[in-house]
A protein has these predicted regions:
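Membrane-proximal basic amphipathic "stem/tether" segments
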Residues: 1-18, 297-356
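PAPS-dependent sulfation machinery
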Residues: 48-129, 134-135, 170-174
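P-loop (Walker A) phosphate-binding loop of NTP-binding proteins
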Residues: 29
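Conserved phosphate-donor/acceptor-positioning beta-strand/loop module used by diverse small-molecule
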Residues: 130-131, 141-166
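A structural motif corresponding to the C-terminal end of an alpha-helix
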Residues: 118-121, 194-206, 276, 283, ...
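Lumenal/extracellular "mature" regions of secretory-pathway glycan-modifying transferases
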Residues: 169-187
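The conserved 3'-phosphoadenosine-5'-phosphosulfate
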Residues: 200-278, 282, 299-309
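A conserved segment at the C-terminal end of the G1
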Residues: 35-47
Length: 356
């Protein structure tokens, strides 16, 4: 598929309210359906089509420091132009260079400049963003992009746990390898809990959507999201256009073959033993119930052994500490560039943009 596709909504502008032009952030814990919902919005038309996560706040803003400093902006652009993140925009450096150097003062400015340039090139007036980790940066995002609308997609934490455990995305500490399946469960609780606290402070600019509702009752769910963002999310059109993961589900269980999104619901029941289900539900049961899910393990049986209780206490502190290190220490300036699609050897005055 080409990086930039023709947007069929181009040329059909009408008088629109400020909210109907506002950027939309589709956020959630990893493996919760953020990409699926993001591609659903893009398939509806009227949004800039960008087949990548921007990683603006969780990587670019941390790595390149204070963008009010001209030299930091220059360094950001020089490295950004060599990255897959930029290649997938379909832009040329001339499309953003002057405006970034003259007008950009923070990460929000940079993201808006890039996404608005994509939108202009495609003839639309709106953009969306779907980096899952941006859920942890909601207060900053809302500060620097005040008109941002946030759709927090929440999926059953047990299915998220099964998916994250399958791909080994979150590694346990060495002494917890025997209970590695619990680490993504605790991460889900930590991430979704923070996202909900941050989101509810945004008032009418924040909405929560369940992945299961989007998959099992798409018309009504899309109608609700459409009212929130003031955008026509026509289900039939979305199915016809079917960009990205709307057409090809992003499953971590590749051995299952091409399956529908609906087939991913409740997979944890087949993957975990009753003992593992008990431990997972003892770790995240309260948040599962708060977000509308039913538990399998009776309350009287949800008692965890001491090692599990220690994990429930220590891992959130560990996750908080990692975020603090990246946000408030020089560690971010030497962060791995792989999320940008840059190899260390690619950066330099002779670096060339990727053309494949």
């Amino acid at each position: 598929m080409e990086n930039v596709v023709e947007n069929q909504a181009a040329g059909h502008e009408a008088a629109l309210s400020a909210r109907s032009r506002a950027p939309v952030f589709v956020l959630g814990c990893g493996r919760s359906g953020t990409k699926f919902l993001y591609h659903t919005l893009l398939s509806a038309g009227g949004f800039a089509v960008y087949h990548a996560e921007s990683n603006a706040f969780n990587l670019l803003g941390l790595r390149f420091g204070n963008l009010a400093i001209s030299s930091n902006r220059r360094q950001l652009l020089d490295e950004y132009y060599t990255s897959k993140l930029f290649h997938r925009t379909g832009l040329d450096p001339i499309d953003i260079d002057k405006r970034v150097m003259e007008d950009c003062r923070n990460t929000g400015d940079f993201l808006r400049i890039v996404m608005e340039a994509i939108a202009r090139k495609q003839g639309v007036n709106r953009w969306a963003e779907s980096t899952p980790l941006h859920l942890l940066f909601l207060p900053l995002i809302k500060k620097v992009i005040p008109d941002a609308l946030v759709v927090h997609i929440i999926r059953d934490g047990r299915d998220v746990t099964a998916s994250l455990h399958r791909i080994g995305w979150i590694r346990p500490l060495p002494w917890d390898r025997a209970r590695a399946f619990l680490v993504p469960a605790i991460y889900w609780r930590w991430t979704v809990g923070k996202g909900r606290r941050y989101g509810r402070a945004l008032g009418s600019d924040y909405i929560e959507v369940h992945y299961e509702d989007l998959v099992q009752n798409p018309r009504d769910t899309l109608a609700s999201i459409g009212r929130f963002i003031e955008h026509d999310l026509d289900y039939d059109r979305i199915q016809q256009v079917a960009l990205g993961s709307v057409h090809n589900p992003n499953s971590s269980f590749r051995g299952d073959g091409k399956e529908t999104e609906a087939a991913t619901i409740g997979r944890w029941k087949r993957m975990f033993t009753p003992q593992q289900v008990r431990d997972v539900e003892s770790s995240i049961g309260s948040l599962l119930v708060d977000t509308g899910y039913t538990l399998e393990t009776p309350l009287t049986e949800r008692h965890s052994p001491l090692p599990v209780r220690l994990m429930n206490f220590l891992y959130p502190l560990y996750f908080d500490f990692k975020i603090w290190l990246k946000s408030y220490t020089p560690l971010a300036r030497i962060a791995d560039k792989r999320r940008m699609g840059i190899a260390e050897s690619d950066v330099g005055p002779d670096a060339k943009s990727e053309t494949k």
